[in-house]
Amino acid sequence: MTVIDGKALGVKLQAALAEKTARLKEEKGLVPGLVVILVGENPASQVYVRNKERSALAAGFKSEVVRVPDTISESDLLDLIERYNQDDEWHGILVQLPLPAHISEEKVLLAIDPDKDVDGFHPTNMGKFWSGHPVMIPSTPAGIMEMFKEYQIELEGKSALVIGRSNIVGKPMAQLLLDADATVTIAHSRTKNLPDLARQADILVVAIGRGHFVTKEFVKLGAVVIDVGMNRDENGKLIGDVKYDEVSEVASYITPVPGGVGPMTITMLMEQTYEACVRSAK
């Protein structure tokens, strides 16, 4: 069994990104700029934002975190986003989710300039992605594909099951696997006979948001298991959707939590910010 080390791969890719960024600054005078808007004081969101800021600075980017209270009005938040849309120094705009109940997530995502939507959630970018002309790709699935590439995991002709159907992970993950010539099934919490279905998969991507949902009985011998889950157990410990200790006994490759998919998500956000900066100069 091989542990897929997303943390180490992220460090490797971000070192290469820092070199590209230095060359871009030297040759074209361009510095990628990433702004992250944090609404309120959600502890988990603050950790994610801090990690994004740290990665942006390590890559040589211009980085800013804008913290606003959770009492901010929807219109004021939209005005703030528009200010960064109009500022050419910023190439990536992220609004950290979740948002307070009085603010429409859909309106906020629509407000971000598609050219600066490095999360890849704007309908314009989603449409380009689904039609086979991707510009911004949701970063978690993109990071998982980089893992497959780094570890030389063959996808062509393989049976892949994605457990989870969100627009952020499940659906785009399935599309990327299809594009790599895997045969793909999407399952979810209401799928019948899910363990039986899962045991047929060569590649298992789990993004269902339930701690230790996938046990050994879901996994056939030699399967590749990618755990996207980020949950807390009763002791506050970070755990994945996969019961790592027992599934690692049967999997050929597996991602840990933490240190698996999470670091790669942030790495791909940085890559897409860099690419957005390069495109802005054309």
Swiss-Prot record:
Homodimer. Pathway: One-carbon metabolism; tetrahydrofolate interconversion. It comes from the Bacteria. Keywords: Amino-acid biosynthesis, Histidine biosynthesis, Hydrolase, Methionine biosynthesis, Multifunctional enzyme, NADP, One-carbon metabolism, Oxidoreductase, Purine biosynthesis. GO terms for biological process: L-histidine biosynthetic process; methionine biosynthetic process; purine nucleotide biosynthetic process; tetrahydrofolate interconversion. The gene is folD. Catalyzes the oxidation of 5,10-methylenetetrahydrofolate to 5,10-methenyltetrahydrofolate and then the hydrolysis of 5,10-methenyltetrahydrofolate to 10-formyltetrahydrofolate. Its EC number is 1.5.1.5, 3.5.4.9. Belongs to the tetrahydrofolate dehydrogenase/cyclohydrolase family. This is Bifunctional protein FolD. One of its GO terms (molecular function) is methylenetetrahydrofolate dehydrogenase (NADP+) activity. It comes from Streptococcus suis (strain 05ZYH33). NADP(+) binds at G164, R165, S166, S189. It catalyses: (6R)-5,10-methylene-5,6,7,8-tetrahydrofolate + NADP(+) = (6R)-5,10-methenyltetrahydrofolate + NADPH; (6R)-5,10-methenyltetrahydrofolate + H2O = (6R)-10-formyltetrahydrofolate + H(+). GO terms for cellular component: cytosol. The keyword Oxidoreductase applies.
